[in-house]
Amino acid sequence: MRKLSKIFLLALFVTVAMAQTPEPPLSDTRLTIHTLVREDIFAGFLSNDTGRLSRGEKNVQLLLEKRPAAKAELLAWQAGTSMYRAVSAYEDNRNDDFQKYYKQALDQFAQARQNDKSGGGVDAVTGGVYAVFGDRLPKEYRAAAWAQAYDSFQTLWKLQGPAVDKLPVHLRGELLGGLAMSAMRTGRTEEAGKYVDKILALLGNTPYESVAKKWKDNPKTIENTSIACLTCHESGRLNARLTALNSAK
C-alpha cells in the first residue's frame, strides 16, 4: 500500500508539473525548434524531470515530420536525450542499458552531422550535451566526448566569435565556458586560460565571472569543475518568447 501511495504521489507531482508548463505550440513557425524543445529537455538534463523530458522527446519526433528542414538539429536533440539516458543508466549500474543508449546517442550525433547543411545548430547542441554529460561518462569514454565537445565549440567560435560581445549573456557564457572547459579537458591549458580571460572581460557581474575567477586563481580546477548551464535554462523562457513575439505584432 505504501509503495502504491508513493507511485500515486509521483504521478500526481508529474501531472501538476506538466500542467504548470503548457504544451509547446509546435505549429507556431515563428519559434525555432530549439525554443520549442529546449525547456522540456533541459528539465530532464538538469532536474531529472523525466515527464518533461519524455514530452520533449515526443515533440522532437513530431517536429521531424513538421519541419524536415530542421532534421539535423532535431537529430542532435535526440542524441542528447539518448546521452542523458545513457548516463542515468551508468550511474544506476545498468551497464547493458548504458551501452544501448550510448551507442544510440553516437549514431544520432553522426546522423545529425551528416544531415547538417547550415552549421551552428548541431554543434551548439552537441557541445552543450557533452559539456553537461562528458564528466559523467565512464572514464574510458570521456576523452572522446571532450574531443567532440572541443571540435563543436571551435566551430561555434568561428561562427560567433567575431560578435561574441554582442551575444546574449547566456549564449556568450555557454560559448566561452564551453571553449575553456573543452580546451582544458583535451590538454590545451594555455588556450583554456585565454578563454578564461575572455570570460572575465566579457561576462562581469554574471555567474560565469565568479567561476572564471576561481579558475584564474587556480587553473587546475578547470579540470574538475563546470561552468555549463549557469543561466537561462529555467522554466518560462518559451512563454516569455511567445509574449515578446505577440507584443511585436
Predicted stretch roles:
Residues 23-28, 32, 36-58, 81-113, ...:
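Short coil/linker segments at helix-helix boundaries
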Residues 180-181, 185, 200-221:
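Sequence context of c-type cytochrome heme-c attachment sites
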Residues 225-236:
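The canonical Cys-X-X-Cys-His
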